[in-house]
Amino acid sequence: MSSQGHHKMSGGGKKGAMEQDYTDVVDLGDRFSADMARLCMNEQYADVEFIVEEERIPAHRVILAARSEYFRALLYGGMAETTQRQIPLEVPLEAFKVLLRYIYSGTLLLSTLDEDSTIDVLGMANQYGFQDLEMAISNYLRQYLALDNVCMILDAARLYNLEELTEVCLMFMDRNAGDLLLHNSFNTLSKESLEEVLRRDCFFAPEVQIFLAVWKWSRFNSNVDFKSVVSYVRLPLMNLEHLLQVVRPSGILDPDKILDAIDERSTSKALPYRAALWPEENVAAETFLSRCIQGECRDALLDGDVTTYDMENGYTRHCITDSKDAGIVVELGTFCMINHIRMLLWDRDSRAYSYYVEVSGDQQHWDRVVDYSDYHCRSWQYLYFEARPVRFIRLVGTQNTVNRVFHVVGLEAMHTAKVPRLVNHFVAPKTNVATVEMSAIVTDGVSRTRNALINGDYVRYDWDSGYTCHQLGSGEIVVRLGQPYYLGSMRLLLWDCDDRTYSFYIEISTNRKEWQMVVDRRNDRTRSWQNFHFTPRPVVYIRIVGTRNTANEIFHCVHLECPTQDKNYLKKIADMEKEREKREKEKKTAKTDDDNIASTSGSSLASGHAESPSTSSSSSQSVLRSIHWPPQTREVAVAPLTPPALSPPGTPALPAPLTPATSSPHNNHEQNQPSNISADASHHTSPSSRSNPSPSLSRSRSQSAELEPVPPLVELDTRETL
């Protein structure tokens, strides 16, 4: 046991040894605090006196200086107070005594203080630099917010720059806006705090009620210029009756302001709505009085059931047409501030949908917040956009790869603080989105389990299971993500239970028609883990095509993730990006200097200082060709390749060569003319019609014969048939 632990001490005696516990750590902190507390406001040993509200309070310089940087500078910093015995302070007396007790004892019982004293102590803690006490009081006040104290606490929080306490107060006022406007404490708000409250979109109450409260506040604060305050009242949100019968008779607004408000209300396409804010809560629910007002089978959309649905029940739908009125429309119970929508598309097969989402405040003017009309999507959709007041949500399907109907099983709408990085409205994820949980699916390839490539298990694999494969020259592996993501990296685990190597390339697409090659390893011999980095772009489909296996004619992949989750590789990417930005900045600086020289000399030097092409100039066909780090900063344009066609259903079982292939993968690729394959064009291939294209094909016949029978493979060339 360590020297700071407990020990046992034994001693001899007629009745045997006796054991006694002891410790080498002496902790008498409570007694020390009590002794120090007795010195508080005690004449004994006192060497300074504070004059507060004409009362003399003795204190000890060294204790105050040790506890506060403010007092150290005041009492030992060479100022006039350094040599003075008596120092006057302009602070509340009772609150100062409370603070002194805290300085000497380190404890403070806040429950014994009234609200005014608590605020006074908070102010002195801020003034004298007691940050721990300031934070403790701030946290205490957060727990006891009420209508009769929130205005006072907000003023104090803003005065002392307590941002967290300020935000909590504002959110409390948002939640209780209607009651707060009628409470007498509202009239005690400072002008600056009132303006901060009124400018918030989520301070949600009828605008006429807000106007009346501001008008009343102006009468209680007649010495304040309230013109800037009343300017935060959103007059266009009031109807004509309120403007003419409430606002105009008050006489506090110019008649032209009222006319402008009437005109804006009738002509504006984007009124400055206020909305209720319920963080992290689904407001598209029956508990918030929300309802589906357009679409077929409307009751299913907001019932909260996202598990018990099939081909006949459990979804809301609309026919996909060119009509502007087509779609599924949800009316929220009231105006709500939202920035996130979760939507479950019908996913009992591998079909894909395209759609867009619009929001509105009046069903007349719609703002499109998400547009995936040109992208294939499936299952759960995670949509993010700039927070805004919303009353109506419209979902419009533009494509179904099986028929002309758009099916939605469930919808959630909320305001969340967990917003990922967005690039051109696409989510740029940090975590792996090529997973079953994120609605990804393997549409092409051969495996014992459908989604072995994206199930997250890259440890349990062997000769017979745990991988997805295709035959060289006549197949491919295709993964479809749940929705378009803005991606710039991937990581792939090639089957590596022996020392074989592979060659391959990777293409990406958003619609399975137009492909871009982003990784080219056809001339490399690779094995095990492979990291890739390419120019970021929207991605839905990922196509992996093997071109060589040094052991047999089958290409095997164990695991795919995008973006890569390799922390070391991500750090290298970040470092390389910083270096690239630094070089671009230096180029711009050099070009600016050259332009200045050219303009001064009167000669054109633009051609002599032209920039070299950047790596992003050919981003549409950029290909990463190096297997080693760092990736080449100069990408080489390569004509995109289309994979060979799959063998039609009913073809003979895959060959099982027992020796490594001798033919060139490039020759095989040329002999099999490439062709595009639609995922929705044909029927399923029977699992029993294929033999097992296992890595074990390279072993001897005797070894293969001794193997136990294995489950049949699943052919993942998925075709929708509904």
Curated annotation (Swiss-Prot):
Expression across tissues: Detected in the brain (at protein level).
Stretches for region Disordered: 577-626, 640-722
Regions of compositional bias (Polar residues) in chain numbering: 597-606, 670-679
Compositionally biased residues, Basic and acidic residues: 577-594
Ranges of compositional bias, category Low complexity: 607-626, 686-704
Domain of life: Eukaryota
Phenotypic effect of disruption: Adults display increased motor activity during locomotion, fragmented sleep and a decreased lifespan. Walking speed is not effected however flies spend more time moving with slightly fewer pauses resulting in longer uninterrupted bouts of walking. The total duration of sleep is not effected but average sleep bout length is decreased, the number of sleep bouts is increased and the amount of wake after sleep onset (WASO) is also increased. Dopamine levels are decreased by 50%. No effect on flight or climbing (negative geotaxis).
Pfam families associated with the record: BACK, BTB, F5_F8_type_C
Coiled-coil ranges from the UniProt annotation: 565-593
Subcellular location: Cytoplasm
Pro residues compositional bias, start-end: 641-658
Transmembrane regions: none
GO cellular component: cytoplasm
Alphabetical keyword list: Coiled coil, Cytoplasm
Any one Gene Ontology BP term: regulation of synaptic transmission, dopaminergic
Domain BACK: residue ranges: 151-247
The BTB domain, residue ranges: 46-112
Cross-referenced SMART domains: BACK, BTB
Function field: Essential for the homeostatic regulation of sleep and motor activity, by depressing hyperactivity and wakefulness. May function, at least in part, by ensuring dopamine biosynthesis.
UniProt-recorded name of the protein: BTB/POZ domain-containing protein 9
This protein's encoding gene: BTBD9
